[in-house]
Regions:
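Mobile, glycine/GP-rich and aromatic-enriched active-site lid/loop segments adjacent to catalytic centers
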Residues: 1-140, 219-340
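Long, amphipathic alpha-helical stalk/connector segments used for oligomerization, subunit docking
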Residues: 161-256
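Alpha-helix termini
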Residues: 143-144, 161, 302
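A conserved FAD-binding loop/helix module that cradles the flavin
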Residues: 133-155
Length: 340
C-alpha cells in the first residue's frame, strides 16, 4: 500500500478502489510469485439460482471465456478458474479514459465542453455515442441505447437547422474514394497470379498479416501485456517509426472478397487508432493509470502538471497528431457541493 501511495497519492484511499489500482495490485501479486489468481465461483455456484444467473452473465457478456473453460475442462462449479489481466491498450476497457471530444448538453456542460449540438464532435455534422465518446459501465446496453437516442435527436436537429443550405458532393472526389475503397480487391486480383499457393505474396499484404504486425508493434512498443504494460519515450519513438512503415504497406493490402475488404479497412482504422494511442501516451508525461500502463521514465502520477484532459487533432496532410491540454471540471462533485 505504501508503494502505491507514493505513486498515486491520495487516490489510493478512494472508495471503491479505482479499477486500475486493482489491476496494479493483481500484477504485483503475480510478480511476487503469488499466482495464479483465481475467480471464486465454487461457493456461489452451489446455489442453483446463482449458478443460472452466473451462466447468463458469462454467456451474455464473455462467451469467449465460457468457451475457453470448456476447452480446458474447467467447470466453475467444481474449479475456481484462473484470471489473467489483459487490458486493451486504449486505456481502461470498461473504465476507459479515452474517446472523441464532443459537445456536451446545453443544460449541464461547462462552456468549454459545449459548443453546439449535443454529442457533436469537432468535425461539423459528425455525432458520436457510446464508447466513441468514452466508455463507462453506464454505457452498457440501456446506457448506450439512451446515448444513441440523444445523439440521434441532436443530429436530426442539426439537419433540420441546415434548411436548404445542404452540402454539395463533389462527383470527382466521390469517384476517387470509390476507387480507393475497392483497391484491395484489385490488388488481390492482379497479385494472386504471381504465387501458386500459400498466403505470402510479393505484391499484396493480407489483412491478417497486417493485423498481426500491428499487434506486435503495440505490444512491444506501447506498453502491452508482453512488456508488463511498461513503456518509455525511446520505445514509443521506435514504435511510431514502425507504425509509419506499416501505414506505407497498407497501400498494398489485398482482399479476396468483400469480407476481407472489410478487414482491410478495419486494419486502416486500427492503425490510425494505434497512432493516436501512441501519441497520447507519449504526450502525457506521467503514470496516470498504473495497472493499465506504466511510464518507466515518468513513474508517478503528477496532478500538478497533468490533472487535465489531453486532446489530439490529426493533420491528414502531414500525418501528425497535434496535442494540447484541456481543463478537467468535476461537474458531479460541484453539483453535490451546491446541493449540500
Amino acid at each position: 500500500r505504501d508503494s502505491i501511495e507514493q505513486m498515486v497519492g491520495d487516490y489510493v484511499n478512494h472508495e471503491p478502489v479505482p479499477t486500475c489500482l486493482r489491476n496494479h495490485a493483481f500484477l504485483k501479486e503475480v510478480e511476487a510469485g503469488g499466482g495464479p489468481i483465481r475467480m471464486v465461483t465454487k461457493e456461489a455456484f452451489k446455489d442453483p439460482h446463482k449458478e443460472i444467473v452466473g451462466w447468463e452473465n458469462f454467456l451474455g457478456m464473455t462467451i469467449g471465456q465460457a468457451v475457453v473453460w470448456a476447452a480446458n475442462n474447467i467447470d466453475p462449479k467444481e474449479i475456481n478458474p484462473e484470471l489473467v489481466m489483459s487490458e486493451p491498450y486504449v486505456m481502461g476497457s470498461h473504465a476507459t479514459c479515452s474517446g472523441a471530444w464532443a459537445s456536451g448538453p446545453e443544460d449541464y456542460a461547462p462552456d468549454e465542453y459545449q459548443w453546439g449540438y449535443n454529442r457533436m464532435m469537432t468535425v461539423d455534422g459528425l455525432f458520436g455515442a457510446g464508447d466513441t465518446l468514452g466508455g463507462t459501465p453506464h454505457k452498457f446496453s440501456s446506457g448506450s441505447f439512451t446515448e444513441g437516442r440523444l445523439a440521434g435527436k441532436a443530429a436530426v436537429k442539426y439537419v433540420n437547422d441546415l434548411g436548404t443550405n445542404v452540402p454539395e458532393v463533389d462527383e470527382a472526389e466521390y469517384m476517387a474514394l470509390q476507387v480507393e475503397i475497392y483497391q484491395p480487391l484489385e490488388n488481390y486480383r492482379v497479385g494472386r497470379n504471381e504465387i501458386t499457393g500459400g498466403t505470402v505474396s510479393p505484391s499484396y499484404l493480407l489483412p491478417l498479416a497486417g493485423l498481426q504486425r500491428l499487434e506486435k508493434i503495440m505490444d512491444e512498443y506501447c506498453g502491452g501485456c508482453g512488456q508488463r504494460y511498461m513503456v518509455n519515450t525511446p520505445l514509443m519513438e521506435r514504435g511510431i517509426e514502425l507504425l509509419k512503415m506499416l501505414k506505407e504497406d497498407l497501400a498494398n493490402l489485398g482482399a479476396d472478397g468483400l469480407h476481407q475488404l472489410l478487414r482491410a479497412w478495419e486494419l486502416h482504422h486500427r492503425v490510425l487508432a494505434s497512432e493516436c494511442v501512441m501519441a497520447h501516451t507519449m504526450y502525457r508525461e506521467e503514470t496516470r493509470w498504473p495497472g493499465y500502463y506504466y511510464r518507466g521514465d515518468f513513474p508517478k502520477l503528477d496532478d500538478k502538471n497533468w490533472h487535465c484532459f489531453t486532446l489530439s487533432q490529426y493533420d491528414e496532410r502531414s500525418g501528425e497528431f497535434h496535442m494540447e491540454k484541456a481543463p478537467v471540471y468535476h461537474i458531479v462533485d460541484e453539483h453535490k457541493k451546491a446541493a449540500e
